Amino acid sequence: MPAKFIFVTGGVTSSLGKGITAASLGRLLKSRGLKVAIQKFDPYINIDPGTMSPYQHGEVFVTDDGAETDLDLGHYERFIDISLTKASNVTAGKVYWSVITKERRGDFLGGTVQVIPHITNEIKARLLRVAEESDPDVVITEIGGTVGDIESLPFLEAIRQMKSDIGRDRVLYIHVTLVPYLRAAGEAKTKPTQHSVKELRSIGIQPDIIVCRTERPFSREMEEKIALFCDIDPDAVIQAWDADSIYEVPLMMQEEGLDSIVVERLKLNCGPAQMDDWRAMVAKLKNITRHLEIALVGKYVTLPDAYLSVVESLRHAGMYHNVQVDIRWIYSADLERGGLEQLQDVAGILVPGGFGDRGVEGKIIAARYAREHGIPFLGICLGMQLAVVEFARHVCGLEAANSSEFNPETPHPVIDLLPEQKEIEDKGGTMRLGLYPCRLQPGTRAHQAYGEEIIYERHRHRYEFNNNYRAELTARGMVISGTSPDDRLVEIIELADHPWFVACQFHPEFKSRPNRPHPLFRDFIGAACRRAGGGAG
C-alpha cells in the first residue's frame, strides 16, 4: 500500500511544540503496528545547523549517517525509537543549493528557474524520497517556522500541491496553534487560532486536525467554536495542555483521540495503540521522590536547549535508578574566577561538548575537582579532551599541555587535529561525523557498562587524543578503555584509582532512549547515587 503523508504546521507563535506533537503521533502510530517515517523541513537558508550558534538554534543533533540536524530529530528518535538519516532534515538552503546546482549543470535546458515549479518540485521530491527509502506506512513531516513567515511559503505551497499530486485520501494536515488563557478575563481565547487557520486556508490548505496548545483544558463549547470557525469536526480539535513532562504528551494525545482520528481519516489498516509500557514509564516518572543533583559545566548554560539530548539522557538514567536528576547549571567561565563552592555538594559532574576557547579553563578546573575529590565524572567530546589536558598538566607534570585547538603553539599538544582534517578549510559538514565503531577493553568501566566488545557511537569532532602521549599518560594511571578497531583513535578514557571517572570522544546522548538509557549515562548516575547515599536504584 502506498505511504500516507501527514503534514504538521504551526501558527501564532514559534516553540509551540510541533516537534513534540509530531513525535507523539509517531509513537502512537508505531504502537499500532504501523511503520513510521518522520522528517523536519526547516525554512532557513543555512545548509544545516552545524555552523549555527547554539544560542540561535539550540543543540545540533547528529544522525547515524553523519547529518548535522535540528534538535527536533532528537525528539523523533527518542519518542519513536528509530534511527533517522540525512533525508530526515531538509533546509531551504539544501533545496536551493540543489536547484541551483541543477541549473548550472544545464538540467533545466535554459528555462527560467522559479520558486514554482522548480523549488516546490525539489521539496516534493525530498518528501517522496523518505517514503522510497524506508517503505513506511506513514510519513510525518513537520514544517518549521510559523504560517505567515515568508521563508515558509514554498514549503507550504509544496505540501498544498501534494494532495492533488498523490490524492486527497493519502494526505492529512495537522495545524498546531495557540489558545492563550487570559488570567485577567479568566478564560481562554480562540481568536489567535481562528486567524492562524484563516492564514493557512488563504494559501490553499484546510487543516483536518487542529492541535491547541493551552495552559489549561478548555470547555467542549470552546472546541465547538473553534471547529465552527475553522471548518473542521469538533472531535478534530485536540487539546494539548501544559504537562509536567514531555513524555506525558503521547498519552495526552491518545486520550484526546489524535491517533484514532488520523487512522480513520487516512483509512490505515492497524490495531489499537499498545501504550502499556509507555504508560508504566510515565507512572514511574511521576512517582519518583528522591532527588539527585548533577553539575553540568558548560559554555551555553543560559540556553538549556543547547544541551537538550544531554539533559534528556540524564533524565532517562534517573528514571532507571528511580531518582529525579536536578541539574545545577554552571557557566564554566565562572570557575576561572573562583566559584568552586558550586561543585562542593553535587553528586556528579558532567562536562559536555562545545566549541571555542571561552570557558575552557573552567571546564579543566571542573575535571580536576572531580578527579581530586572522587566525584563521579562524565566528559563528552570536548569534555574528554579537557579531562586529558587536565591529567597531563596536573598528574603528568606537563604544565603547558593543551589542545592545539586553543593553543597552536603549546609544547605538549595532548589533543591535536585529526590528520585528515589538516588540509580542510571549510567549516560546514567537514568534521568526523556520524556512527563509528569502538573496541572496548575488557575489565574497564566502559566494558562493564556496555557488556560487549564492539560498540557503535555517533561522533562530531575535528580534534583527537594525540597518541604521542599515550604511553606517558597511561603510565600515570589513565586507562584507554576504548579505541577505534585499528587502535589509531582513542575513544574512551577513564581513571583506574577513581570511583567513576569516564570520558568519551563520541556523543552518547544521541542514542539514549527514555525506556533504554544509554549505558554510560546509566552507570554515571548509578555512581552518583552511590556517592549521594542510598545506592543506585
From Swiss-Prot:
Entry keywords, A to Z: ATP-binding, Glutamine amidotransferase, Ligase, Magnesium, Metal-binding, Nucleotide-binding, Pyrimidine biosynthesis
Keyword Cell wall biogenesis/degradation belongs to the record: no
Binding residues for UTP: 14, 189-194, 225
Keyword ATP-binding appears in the UniProt entry: yes
Activity modulation notes: Allosterically activated by GTP, when glutamine is the substrate; GTP has no effect on the reaction when ammonia is the substrate. The allosteric effector GTP functions by stabilizing the protein conformation that binds the tetrahedral intermediate(s) formed during glutamine hydrolysis. Inhibited by the product CTP, via allosteric rather than competitive inhibition.
Enzyme class: ligase
Residue stretches making up the Glutamine amidotransferase type-1 domain: 293-534
GO molecular function list: ATP binding; CTP synthase activity; glutaminase activity; identical protein binding; metal ion binding
Region (Amidoligase domain): 1-268
CDD domains: CTPS_N, GATase1_CTP_Synthase
Catalysed reactions, as listed in the record: UTP + L-glutamine + ATP + H2O = CTP + L-glutamate + ADP + phosphate + 2 H(+); L-glutamine + H2O = L-glutamate + NH4(+); UTP + NH4(+) + ATP = CTP + ADP + phosphate + 2 H(+)
Signal peptide region: none
List of residues binding ATP: 15-20, 72
Active site: 381, 507, 509
Coiled coil residues, start to end: none
NCBIfam families: PRK05380.1, PyrG
Entries under HAMAP family matching the protein: PyrG (MF_01227)
Note: CTPSs have evolved a hybrid strategy for distinguishing between UTP and CTP. The overlapping regions of the product feedback inhibitory and substrate sites recognize a common feature in both compounds, the triphosphate moiety. To differentiate isosteric substrate and product pyrimidine rings, an additional pocket far from the expected kinase/ligase catalytic site, specifically recognizes the cytosine and ribose portions of the product inhibitor.
Protein's name according to its UniProt entry: CTP synthase
Organism: Moorella thermoacetica (strain ATCC 39073 / JCM 9320)
